[in-house]
């Protein structure tokens, strides 16, 4: 055996990519430990697999991944008892990028399976050989000493990551690998046992291979639980274990409202363990719209940014683990491979099916209503954002109603519609109580027509996107003159409305350009006026939201509708026919309609004065008649 140290240049691809890997590819420095632990776990898994056909390669009983910081020497060592590497392996796997031994082994294993050989497949993750180089984010020099299982020779690979590496003979008592990182000055935190423990529990808690951390006194502490709960059969998992795992992944204190645990098999294989919380999070869900489902590949946590569920299901927490996903160059920058897209679709379908099943369970209707109170506003976002899924989401929604005391659904609403009723009517405002007392509902109540009351922040957006449900159009009661002509008022026959042509003309003239039209309406009973839109654009609530956001609204002004049977309107009509100037009264009517709809008067001071004057006139009448 030659004692000469061999110096080699990195492969051309390494020279080009090493700087990228170290400085740009990884967005979080702590990922270096995930990569090195993953490699060590892979090596251990590979030796266990090869020992199935070669007993001489059997793992020692205490096989583990050991992480040992040394503050005095400023080194961090990651050791394993895995398959190890020969001199050729070190040169091939660490001297070139994207050619790891694990990837070559997976290819060889696939060839063996195609030939009808062993069908057992170890969980191997390092399909791209860039993870090792992340060590140079925290180390200015790395040495790797390894002995291949079944061989007596050991070799040391060393590099400062600047274009070359050395190989020299070494000694190692048992097969396996030691990676020694000579830490940079700004990486002291990774010489602290508590920091290492935190990183391991975050990124590798469910790796099957035991992981231990050795402290300064030489004491070893287990750093991972080593069992991927989602990989166990449901029959072997207790309810308490599910709850504990849910609290771990959600950082919550409640119990899961729903637990989904399944194994997808066939052309696409993955395991899912998902939870729907029973409580809303303390922080508003609008602040963080990312999916809360973690992606694992062969038990190893890859990322929580794979968007495995759409934003409108972001209240769901959990894990999806697959053996079939081809990893891209870096795990935290995993791109949308076709396999991942299929997994997303399958996981989303599973969650929707679960919610659909629970929404139809009449015996547990109150439980579903509680869920909807917690997460309904988020679910509604799916109508606006997900064209493909709108038809599946709509039946899951629940609403307050002008006629029902509790919650109702779109299917239930349609089942109660009057035979001559053409549309599903809804009204949007900021507050449910304001909705219940809205003048917009008077004509509908008089005819026994149900109106859905919408008060969530997203309710101004999604109804127009849904458009219709079961071939019934959704129509805001503020959008144009709702067609109530076919619906007779219940009870007494409606009094014939007087002609108000003179008043209508006077109001139009006085209110231009603040209104686009003035017209009489049969949808008011107790109120004198109400606002409407033309029906060709956003409803009134959407227009208000646009104004609050400073975006304005380029459409037409609202329509002022007046109640021809109201005493105030009749009185104003008489004054209009007598030729009086009604400009001030017209402005007060418009502001009154705005206030009724939860908006502000155009000029609050002028409106207050008008109201005060009207009250003063009312108070003076008894004195005048005395």
From Swiss-Prot:
PROSITE patterns: HSP90. It is found in: Cytoplasm. Keywords: ATP-binding, Chaperone, Cytoplasm, Nucleotide-binding, Stress response. Residues 1-331 are annotated as: A. InterPro entries: HATPase_C_sf (IPR036890), Heat_shock_protein_90_CS (IPR019805), HSP90_C (IPR037196), Hsp90_fam (IPR001404), Hsp90_N (IPR020575), Ribosomal_Su5_D2-typ_SF (IPR020568). CDD domains: HATPase_Hsp90-like. The keyword Glycoprotein does not apply. It holds the Pfam family HSP90. Residues 545-626 are annotated as: C. One of its GO terms (cellular component) is cytoplasm. GO terms for molecular function: ATP binding; ATP hydrolysis activity; ATP-dependent protein folding chaperone; unfolded protein binding. The keyword Cytoplasm applies. Residues 332-544 are annotated as: B. Belongs to the heat shock protein 90 family. Homodimer. This is Chaperone protein HtpG. The gene is htpG.
């Amino acid at each position: 055996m030659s004692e000469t140290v061999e110096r080699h240049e990195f492969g051309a691809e390494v020279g080009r990519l090493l700087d990228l890997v170290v400085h740009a590819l990884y967005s979080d420095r702590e990922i270096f430990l995930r990569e090195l632990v993953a490699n060590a776990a892979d090596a251990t898994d590979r030796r266990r697999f090869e020992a199935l056909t070669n007993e001489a390669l059997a793992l020692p009983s205490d096989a583990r991944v050991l992480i040992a910081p040394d503050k005095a020497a400023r080194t961090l060592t990651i050791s394993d008892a895995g398959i190890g590497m020969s001199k050729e392996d070190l040169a091939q796997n660490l001297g070139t990028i994207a050619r790891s031994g694990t990837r070559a082994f997976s290819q060889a294993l696939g060839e063996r399976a195609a030939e009808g050989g062993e069908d057992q497949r170890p969980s191997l993750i390092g399909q791209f050989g860039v993870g090792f180089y992340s060590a140079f984010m925290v180390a200015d020099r790395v040495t790797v000493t390894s002995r291949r299982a079944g061989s007596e020779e050991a070799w040391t690979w060393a590099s400062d990551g600047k274009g070359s590496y050395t190989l020299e003979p070494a000694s190692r008592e048992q097969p396996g690998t030691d990676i020694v990182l000579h830490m940079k000055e700004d990486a002291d935190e990774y010489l602290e046992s508590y920091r290492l423990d935190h990183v391991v529990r975050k990124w590798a808690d469910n790796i099957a291979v035991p992981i231990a951390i050795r402290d300064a006194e030489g004491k070893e502490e287990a750093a991972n639980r080593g069992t991927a709960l989602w990989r166990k059969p449901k029959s072997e998992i207790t309810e308490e274990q599910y709850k504990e795992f849910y609290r771990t992944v959600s950082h919550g204190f409640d119990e899961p409202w729903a637990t989904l645990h399944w194994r997808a098999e066939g052309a696409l294989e993955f395991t899912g363990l998902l939870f729907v919380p029973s409580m809303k999070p303390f922080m508003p869900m609008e602040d963080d719209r990312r999916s809360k489902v973690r992606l694992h590949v062969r038990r190893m946590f890859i990322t929580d940014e794979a968007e495995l569920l759409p934003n409108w299901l972001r209240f769901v927490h959990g894990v999806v683990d697959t053996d079939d996903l081809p990893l891209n160059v870096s795990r935290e920058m995993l791109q949308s491979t076709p396999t991942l897209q299929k997994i997303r679709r399958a996981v989303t379908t599973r969650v929707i099916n679960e919610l659909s099943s629970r929404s139809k369970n009449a015996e547990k209707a109150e439980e579903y209503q509680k869920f909807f109170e917690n997460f309904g506003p988020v679910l509604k976002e799916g109508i606006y954002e997900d064209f493909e899924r709108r038809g599946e989401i709509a039946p899951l929604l629940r609403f307050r109603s002008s006629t029902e005391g509790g919650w109702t659904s779109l299917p239930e609403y349609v089942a109660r519609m009057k035979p001559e009723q053409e549309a599903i009517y809804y009204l949007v405002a900021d507050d449910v109580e304001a909705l219940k007392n809205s003048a917009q509902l008077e004509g509908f109540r008089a005819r026994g027509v149900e109106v859905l009351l919408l008060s969530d922040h997203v309710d101004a957006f999604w109804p127009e996107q849904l458009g219709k449900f079961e071939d019934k159009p959704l129509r805001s009661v503020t959008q144009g003159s709702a067609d109530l002509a076919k619906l007779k008022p219940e009870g007494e026959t409606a009094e014939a409305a007087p002609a108000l042509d003179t008043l209508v003309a006077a109001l139009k003239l006085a209110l231009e350009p603040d209104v686009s039209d003035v017209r009489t309406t049969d949808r008011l009973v107790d109120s004198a006026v109400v606002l409407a839109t033309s029906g060709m654009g956003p409803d009134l609530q959407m227009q208000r939201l646009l104004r609050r956001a400073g975006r304005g609204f380029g459409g037409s002004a609202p329509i002022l509708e007046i109640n021809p049977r109201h005493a105030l309107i009749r009185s104003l009509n008489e004054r209009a026919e007598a030729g009086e100037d009604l400009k001030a009264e017209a402005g007060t009517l418009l502001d009154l309609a705005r206030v009724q709809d939860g908006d502000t008067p155009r000029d609050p001071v002028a409106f207050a004065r008008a109201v005060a004057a009207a009250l003063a006139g009312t108070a003076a009448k008894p004195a005048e008649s005395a």
